[in-house]
Regions:
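Short, surface-exposed alpha-helical recognition segments that flank or form part
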Residues: 125-126, 291, 295
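N-terminal core-entry segment
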Residues: 3-284, 327-329
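Intrinsically disordered, low-complexity Ser/Thr/Pro/Gly-rich interaction regions
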Residues: 294-339
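A short glycine-threonine-serine/GTX helix/turn-capping micro-motif
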Residues: 284-292
Length: 339
């Protein structure tokens, strides 16, 4: 039942191994990614990547509008709207407008509240939430062409998913909700690109993003889970804005011995971040849910539908159901009293 997740890294790396022999710490990982994000040309985006990014965006809009009336969003709006700044950007599906940073937060919350959003199968990151929430808010504040918007979406997804690839599965196994912790980099990359950051400023934006990780898997089953992509969108956007005004940070935040990857995971694989930049695209690994729940339980739902159809079963004919699943299914979705 958890084959989609288990396939992420069948060739698991050794966990917690120190540098051995002639092994050297990685160098210029953060700079390489920053250089790529600021220099990648919109016109070089392959057509299949452009189409997948469009599908990702449309799927995200549907999720955000669909979740906009949920109690979670109502509560968040009630708490934070009185403290919002100028009415600069939309909260999709609602009449209220907020300042760009609060709008990014709210759209991130609403797009994830039903757990119906896109999934990067290699890492189980939900890529669009942090990135699209941030760049939509920015695009309402300053003019952005459709081509540049789509390119920024692709670059943001590339950044967050490549960074996620480098630390999965140990980062996730340690209890971090990777959509938030990696998503903040995607939001910083995408908004930074639209703000026209230099390579140096993008380096700083990544550093500022890295120092704001959110959230914890213990929050699954509560209103705080969708807060994670919302806060990632808001924090990544904030990082890019600060960097645009030369607010400095570490220039090696991904690869430093006390940097993001080494603190939040074990044995990170930095080649996942840098190899194939501009040649392979993580958005092509995106998937879209037929059911509004964690993907690990989808096979069980499919099985129930198949049995019902094959045997023409009705609910009153079923006394009980016994499922054999991977322990991860219970860990992620076995919430008997969701809040």
């Amino acid at each position: 039942a958890s084959s989609l997740v288990a396939s992420a890294k069948a060739d698991s790396k050794s966990v917690g191994a120190p540098l051995q022999g002639d092994a050297q710490p990685a160098k210029d990982v953060t700079r390489s990614l920053a250089r790529y994000v600021v220099s990648a040309r919109t016109e070089d985006l392959p057509e299949n990547v452009r189409k997948e990014a469009t599908r990702t965006m449309l799927n995200w809009v549907g999720c955000a509008v669909g979740g906009s009336g949920h109690e979670t969003v109502d509560n968040a709006m009630g708490a934070l709207a009185p403290f919002s700044g100028p009415a600069q950007a939309s909260v999709l599906g609602r009449s209220e407008r907020m300042d760009v940073l609060h709008a990014a937060l709210m759209n991130g919350i609403s797009s994830h509240v039903f757990d119906f959003d896109d999934t990067h199968l290699k890492t189980v990151i939900h890529p669009a939430g942090p990135v699209a929430s941030a760049i939509l808010a920015l695009a309402e504040y300053q003019p952005v062409s459709g081509r540049d918007f789509l390119n920024a979406l692709v670059l943001g997804i590339e950044a967050e998913c490549r960074i996620g690839n480098a630390v999965y599965p140990t980062h996730y196994d340690m209890g971090w909700h990777i959509t938030g912790t990696a998503g903040v980099f995607g939001a910083a990359a995408a908004t930074g690109r639209l703000l026209g950051l230099t390579e140096q400023q993008m380096l700083w934006a990544f550093g500022l993003a890295a120092t704001q990780p959110v959230g914890l898997k213990v929050m699954f089953g509560t209103m705080t889970k969708p807060f994670h992509p919302g806060r990632a969108a808001q924090s990544g956007f904030t990082a890019a804005l600060l960097a645009s005004h030369d607010y400095t940070s570490s220039e090696e935040v991904l690869e430093a011995s006390n940097g993001w990857a080494n603190v939040l995971s074990r044995d990170p694989d930095y080649s996942e971040i840098t190899e194939g930049l501009g040649e392979t695209y993580e958005v092509l690994l995106n998937a879209y849910k037929p059911f509004a729940c964690g993907i690990v339980i989808h096979p069980a739902i499919d099985g129930c539908i198949q049995l019902r159809n094959e045997h023409e079963l009705t609910a009153d004919q079923i006394e009980g159901i016994e499922l054999q699943v991977h322990p991860l299914v219970l860990q992620l979705t076995g919430k008997k009293t969701p809040q």
